[in-house]
């Protein structure tokens, strides 16, 4: 099981308003490949914080089509959505301040470490600042 970050869905689903640079096109294709594998049954996890992050971004740019993605993430048997409580948030805030990462990324990190998960699909280099986690980009 790997965790999956909101950045994967952003790159996979959002349509750019301008032409993409070659590096951006490559990242978009890799993100689509990750999403395809998840759709085909690869087991992944995320916290409710990442789910809300995905929802906010996709709803803003995709409108009602975003609900299909959200429904899949909530109901697919191969996607584990982990709860977040006050204790997770408090620990994550400490991590975020110490490592200079966003709170949502720190929440994912705290839950991952508690669950024994060591890899995350992500295009966010902030995960490289977090010990014991390997960022996977394809």
Residue spans for each PLM region:
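Acidic, PIN/NYN-like endoribonuclease modules and their adjacent C-terminal/linker elements
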Residues: 1, 109-138
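Short, well-structured N-terminal submotif of metal-dependent ribonuclease cores
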Residues: 1-46, 60-68
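Histidine- and aromatic-rich ligand-binding microenvironments
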Residues: 2-5, 46-48, 101-102, 124, ...
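Alpha-helix capping/helix-boundary segments
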Residues: 9, 50, 88, 108, ...
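Hydrophobic helix-cap positions at the C-terminus of alpha-helices
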Residues: 37-38, 73, 95
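Structured helix-beta-strand junction loops
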Residues: 40-41, 76-77, 98, 130
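Amphipathic alpha-helical segments within well-ordered protein domains
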Residues: 52-55, 93
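Active-site neighborhoods of divalent-metal-dependent phosphate/nucleic-acid chemistry enzymes
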Residues: 78-119
């Amino acid at each position: 099981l790997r965790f999956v970050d909101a950045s994967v869905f952003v790159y996979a689903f959002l349509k750019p308003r301008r032409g993409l640079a070659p590096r951006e096109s490559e990242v978009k294709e890799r993100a689509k490949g990750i999403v395809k594998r998840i759709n085909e049954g690869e087991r992944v996890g995320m916290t409710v914080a990442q789910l809300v992050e995905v929802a906010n971004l996709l709803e803003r740019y995709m409108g009602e089509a975003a609900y299909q993605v959200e429904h899949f993430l909530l109901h697919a048997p191969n996607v584990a959505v982990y709860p977040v409580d006050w204790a997770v948030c408090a620990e994550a805030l400490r991590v975020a301040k110490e490592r200079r990462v966003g709170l949502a990324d720190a929440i994912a990190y705290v839950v991952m470490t508690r669950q024994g998960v060591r890899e995350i699909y992500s295009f966010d280099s902030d995960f490289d600042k977090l010990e014991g986690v390997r960022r996977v980009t394809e």
